[in-house]
């Protein structure tokens, strides 16, 4: 009976965090709108080999992540939950692997369940795991690779070792097909310190070739298919998306070496108090507990690798938090039995975070001291939603202090208010600039009959395309991340330079309504834009709709 209650509580936990709130949050540009539209076009065209966005070739990532996202939209239709269904599934399956691996290592059901709960409630895991990007998929394949390598090295027969390495190759191959060759670098770097410490070179060299073979066999069918269809894909994907993005001086998203330190700290909420002890236990047990050191290697080595790369994004280190959750669960149980100082420290951190959020909400509210508040006066209810988010965080932090020895796991409920209310608390000024669905909802009657729609933002273009279910949105003035796709001669008409817009407008105006959607500064005078006089203008915050009727 008690176990049934725990199962029901866990199901409710997943439903409240990962299912119920998804349709209350609009899609973000550029990431969510991009992946939503690529997968929608894949379903609409039936082309499961070459990814396209806005009808243009899109070679920034391989295909597997789009497959899973497309299946989500195929199953659940045209909804925000459908767009996020793939990453939610990947996150939940990763949590299942976390629990299974913890059980395999320590044979402790409580530790296994707590590992999964901690993983799912980590703020960085929850944030990325409900956000339609490809990183939750690669995190799953890396976790599966972590499990596969361990199984292979612990197997006592040649059949078991062979199966483990073949499975490792499969996970690496799917990782490559999801996000690229980083899915090969991260596992190799992660296992090397453990192999050296355990002196397991013999097994690695004897069976490692099987992983290479299975990895190649997984990649080969699609790799050959896209090479036949688009011969320059692999050159662009390897050179631009890997070498330039991560290593060269002009890498995208350049950041200093220490960039990930604050992300690790904030991402560990609401379990930050367990972080130092969890890492320390993994290091202290390296000599007599191979599993703890193995987990530590899968945290530290990817973190060092991504820290040394010139290009950095917070999503890159998502895979580090799966092994960290297991170490945190083990350290939490140990602390409850021996010394609850770390558990109480964790409770106070959550109280402090909640109180800080409450104060910060007031400061940026319409009643606060700043001149440009985040929320306008008519958005007062959103301020109260924000206060509720941080009040719940502080409340559950306090609740864990009332009996830290038994109630410390309730820290998993600290982000509950965030999960349920963040969509309602979002300021209109953010929606107007970062969530194109808000703009489409306000201007749909003008957008739908348009023969041509042009915009100067790729993220907005993808949002318009997905919301309106059309892939013929054109780019105006700026090409952004679609520059490479627009260089193909068969799609030159998809981009209109600002200098050519007047002549293009005169040529196409008789074909139907032409709508221009532009990003502008909040205080910019749209009457001074260097475009022909319009028949209709609708200004929505940072976006302005400019419409030309046939003449």
UniProtKB/Swiss-Prot annotation:
Which reaction(s) are listed as its catalytic activity?
Answer: 4-amino-4-deoxy-alpha-L-arabinopyranosyl di-trans,octa-cis-undecaprenyl phosphate + lipid IVA = lipid IIA + di-trans,octa-cis-undecaprenyl phosphate
Q: Which GO terms describe its biological process?
A: lipid A biosynthetic process; lipopolysaccharide biosynthetic process; protein O-linked glycosylation; response to iron(III) ion
Query: What superkingdom heads the lineage?
Result: Bacteria
Give the record's membrane topology.
Multi-pass membrane protein
Keyword Nuclease annotated: no
Q: Which InterPro entries match?
A: ArnT_tfrase, Glyco_trans_39/83, LipidA_mod_glycosyltrf_83
- Entry's localization field: Cell inner membrane
Sorted keywords for this record are: Cell inner membrane, Cell membrane, Glycosyltransferase, Lipid A biosynthesis, Lipid biosynthesis, Lipid metabolism, Lipopolysaccharide biosynthesis, Membrane, Transferase, Transmembrane, Transmembrane helix
Main localisation = membrane
Name of the top EC class for this enzyme: transferase
Q: Write one Gene Ontology MF term.
A: 4-amino-4-deoxy-L-arabinose transferase activity
Q: In which pathway does it act?
A: Lipopolysaccharide metabolism; 4-amino-4-deoxy-beta-L-arabinose-lipid A biosynthesis
Q: Where are the transmembrane segments?
A: 7-27, 81-101, 111-133, 137-154, 176-196, 208-228, 255-275, 289-309, 313-333, 347-367, 383-403, 408-428
Is the Electron transport keyword given for this protein? no
GO CC annotations? plasma membrane
EC numbers listed for it are 2.4.2.43
Q: What does this protein do?
A: Catalyzes the transfer of the L-Ara4N moiety of the glycolipid undecaprenyl phosphate-alpha-L-Ara4N to lipid A. The modified arabinose is attached to lipid A and is required for resistance to polymyxin and cationic antimicrobial peptides.
> Which family does the record claim for this protein?
Belongs to the glycosyltransferase 83 family.
- Return the protein name: Undecaprenyl phosphate-alpha-4-amino-4-deoxy-L-arabinose arabinosyl transferase
- What organism is listed for this UniProt entry? Escherichia fergusonii (strain ATCC 35469 / DSM 13698 / CCUG 18766 / IAM 14443 / JCM 21226 / LMG 7866 / NBRC 102419 / NCTC 12128 / CDC 0568-73)
Question: What taxonomic classification does the UniProt entry list for its organism?
Answer: Bacteria, Pseudomonadati, Pseudomonadota, Gammaproteobacteria, Enterobacterales
């Amino acid at each position: 009976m008690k176990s049934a209650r725990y199962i029901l509580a866990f199901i409710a936990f997943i439903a409240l965090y990962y299912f119920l709130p998804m349709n209350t949050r609009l899609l973000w540009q550029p990431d969510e709108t991009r992946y939503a539209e690529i997968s929608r076009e894949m379903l609409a065209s039936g082309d499961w080999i070459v990814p396209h966005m806005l009808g243009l070739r899109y070679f920034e990532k391989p295909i597997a992540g789009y497959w899973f996202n497309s299946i989500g939209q195929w199953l659940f239709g045209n909804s925000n939950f459908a767009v996020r269904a793939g990453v939610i599934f990947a996150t939940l399956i990763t949590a299942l692997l976390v629990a299974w691996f913890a059980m395999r290592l320590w044979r402790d059901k409580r530790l296994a369940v707590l590992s999964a709960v901690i993983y799912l409630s980590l703020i960085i895991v929850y944030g990325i795991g409900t956000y339609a990007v490809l990183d939750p998929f690669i995190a799953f394949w890396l976790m599966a690779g972590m499990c596969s390598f361990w199984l292979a090295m612990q197997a006592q027969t040649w059949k078991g070792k062979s199966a483990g390495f073949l499975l490792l190759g499969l996970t690496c191959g799917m990782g490559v097909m999801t996000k690229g060759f980083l899915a090969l670098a991260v596992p190799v770097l992660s296992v090397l310190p453990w192999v050296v410490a355990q002196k397991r070179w013999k097994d690695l060299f004897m069976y490692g070739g099987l992983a290479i073979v299975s990895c190649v066999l997984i990649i080969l069918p699609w790799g050959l298919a896209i090479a036949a269809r688009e011969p320059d894909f692999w050159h662009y994907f390897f050179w631009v998306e890997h070498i330039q993005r991560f290593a060269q001086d002009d890498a995208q998203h350049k950041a200093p070496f220490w960039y990930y330190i604050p992300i690790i700290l904030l991402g560990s909420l609401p379990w930050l108090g367990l972080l130092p002890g969890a890492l320390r236990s993994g290091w202290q047990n390296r000599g007599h507990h191979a599993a703890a050191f193995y987990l530590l290697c899968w945290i530290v080595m990817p973190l060092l690798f991504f820290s040394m790369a010139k290009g950095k994004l917070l999503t890159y280190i998502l895979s580090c938090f799966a092994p960290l959750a297991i170490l945190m669960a083990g350290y939490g149980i140990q602390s409850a039995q021996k010394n609850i100082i770390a558990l109480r420290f964790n409770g106070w951190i959550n109280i402090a975070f909640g109180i800080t959020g409450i104060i910060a909400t007031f400061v940026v509210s319409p009643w606060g001291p700043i001149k440009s508040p985040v929320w306008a006066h008519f958005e007062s209810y959103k301020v109260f939603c924000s206060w509720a988010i941080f009040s719940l965080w502080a409340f559950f932090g306090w609740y864990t202090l009332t009996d830290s020895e038994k109630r410390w796991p309730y820290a998993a409920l600290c982000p509950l208010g965030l999960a349920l209310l963040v969509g309602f608390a979002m300021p209109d000024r953010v929606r107007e600039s970062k969530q194109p669905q808000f703009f489409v909802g306000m201007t749909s009657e003008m957008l739908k009959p348009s023969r041509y729609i042009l915009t100067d933002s790729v993220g907005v273009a993808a949002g318009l395309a997905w919301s309106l279910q059309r892939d013929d949105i054109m780019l105006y003035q700026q090409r952004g991340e679609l520059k490479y796709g627009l260089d193909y001669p068969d799609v030159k008409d998809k981009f209109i330079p600002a200098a050519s817009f007047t002549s293009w407008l005169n040529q196409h105006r008789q074909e139907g309504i032409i709508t221009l959607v532009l990003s502008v500064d909040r205080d910019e005078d749209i009457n001074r834009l260097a475009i022909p006089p319009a028949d209709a203008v609708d200004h929505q915050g940072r976006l302005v709709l400019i419409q030309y009727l046939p003449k």
